[in-house]
Amino acid sequence: MTLNSLPAWNSLQTHYGQIRDARLRDWFAPENDPAPTRAERFTLSGGGLAADFSKNRITDDTLKLLVQLAREAQVETRRDAMFAGETVNPTEGRAVLHTALRASNPTSPFYGKVQAERAKMAAFADKVRSGEWTGYTGKRIRHVVNIGIGGSDLGPKMVVHALQHLATPEISTHFVSNVDGADLYRVLQQINPEETLAIIVSKTFTTLETMTNANSLRDWFIQKGCPESELAKHFVGVSANPAEVVKFGIAQENVFEMWDWVGGRYSLWSAVGLSIVIAIGPKQFDELLAGANEMDEHFRSAPLERNLPVLMGMIGIWYRNFFGSQSYLVAPYSEALHFLPSYLQQLEMESNGKQACLDGSFVTYDTSAVTWGEPGTNGQHAFFQMLHQGPTIVPIDFVAVLTPEHPLVSHHPKLLANCFAQSEALMLGRTREEAEKVAGRDKPDLVPHIMFPGNRPTTTLLVDALTARSLGALIALYEHKVLVQGTVWNINSFDQWGVELGKILGKVVEADLTAATVDETKHDSSTSALIARARAALKR
């Protein structure tokens, strides 16, 4: 049975027609919001986090129907299959077991392997952090450069930045991902070879961007005076292809393993997170894993009606497939969470930006929305104008950290006030009558410009304090939300074939850019013209 023929889907279509013009402002009016209030009914806790869903365009009936749809779409079955290690990534014939990386269950068949690799990471990190691990001149390591792209970059970078207040001040962590040489060159200006450790992260150890940067960094070390025989003191590798790592020149004992049952965008919990362990230490990394595991257990055991990942996922489907929203915004009111939106872009869109169902048919409904965002309050001075008064409705996740991780505590009430006020303003709007009072009798022409439609939906996620544990829970919440939505859409959330075609053609174009002659019939006229212009520029 296809998604749009499920009974709950059809009931939701009818229900949407009944409430699409309802106003959040009216639902929150005191006469319409007796105890238990909307805020009380629609605020849930789990995994150490709280989520206020009350400013969404939902009723109790909406949630009942969304949960019914989740059940009819077999969300529980697929969730349990993932945790059991079944092949839930059929196009690649793989299990999906990032949750095993943070599980505390010693009966898991992967427990021993995971614990052994984690112990190896911890021992290595302790050596680097203590100064026992030194470079080729005997100096301690003061710079760690993580070279990777996609999941080998976005997750670790986001976590290291978020938990900088927990990081050792002795070591600076740098991230290089882009094949644009400017990215690596920027970092080279900040480091010196005697005190630098490079972590090369690639599942295959053949990724174009990663290996281009790794080779350039290795050449830089040699040019700066590091003997080739001493390079092993400055390079470690993380890969599922250890033979290729050794071929690159990294010592076997400096190879950390990742597994094909962990997808790149779910891999920060593995050896891919080695830069995290070095930055914040093994104990804090364990806390990160523990927080994620706490959310895993909530996802596995909480009834769907009180299950945070399920409700987040289903409310997202409500806007995407019934309201027709094309994008959704993540606005963390925390500078520490600066890279959360870019991390979630990959997690959400690479996972669920799919057109093919699991059975090979094509979807007849929308899948992943465009995910975007920027920390508050910066975003208020950039794109919130559109959110408040534009004709397009963009659902928003606000993420608020209730206690600051820094000593400038007087700033924090202002930050939180802006977050909560934005959610209230987006919900309430400003009516014509209210606008007329603001404009006054002498400025009637201003009224249309200062009216706000309101009724803009938001969810506010509350984090008591930004700790390694709470961050782990927050990340896992979004991971499981992705599974919920992918299951309902009947797509494979764990492959990424969409990145392959461009890679293949990229190799052809790269060869043409540097070849002595080019067969212009190989490409369309536009691509051929672009190549010709680039060839001319590269010869200057």
Curated annotation (Swiss-Prot):
This protein's UniProt keywords: Cytoplasm, Gluconeogenesis, Glycolysis, Isomerase
One Pfam family named in its UniProt record: PGI
Classification via CDD domains: SIS_PGI_1, SIS_PGI_2
GO BP, sorted A to Z: gluconeogenesis; glucose 6-phosphate metabolic process; glycolytic process
Known catalytic reactions: alpha-D-glucose 6-phosphate = beta-D-fructose 6-phosphate
UniProt-listed Gene3D superfamilies: 1.10.1390.10, Glucose-6-phosphate isomerase like protein, domain 1
Enzyme class: isomerase
Database matches in InterPro entries: G6P_Isomerase, G6P_Isomerase_C, Phosphoglucose_isomerase_CS, SIS_dom_sf, SIS_PGI_1, SIS_PGI_2
Taxonomy, superkingdom: Bacteria
GO CC, one annotated term: cytosol
Pathway: Carbohydrate biosynthesis; gluconeogenesis; Carbohydrate degradation; glycolysis; D-glyceraldehyde 3-phosphate and glycerone phosphate from D-glucose: step 2/4
Database matches in SUPFAM superfamilies: SIS domain
Localization terms from the record: Cytoplasm
EC number(s) reported in the record: 5.3.1.9
Stated role: Catalyzes the reversible isomerization of glucose-6-phosphate to fructose-6-phosphate.
The family this protein is said to belong to: Belongs to the GPI family.
Protein name, as recorded: Glucose-6-phosphate isomerase
Organism the protein comes from: Paraburkholderia phymatum (strain DSM 17167 / CIP 108236 / LMG 21445 / STM815) (Burkholderia phymatum)
Lineage: Bacteria, Pseudomonadati, Pseudomonadota, Betaproteobacteria, Burkholderiales
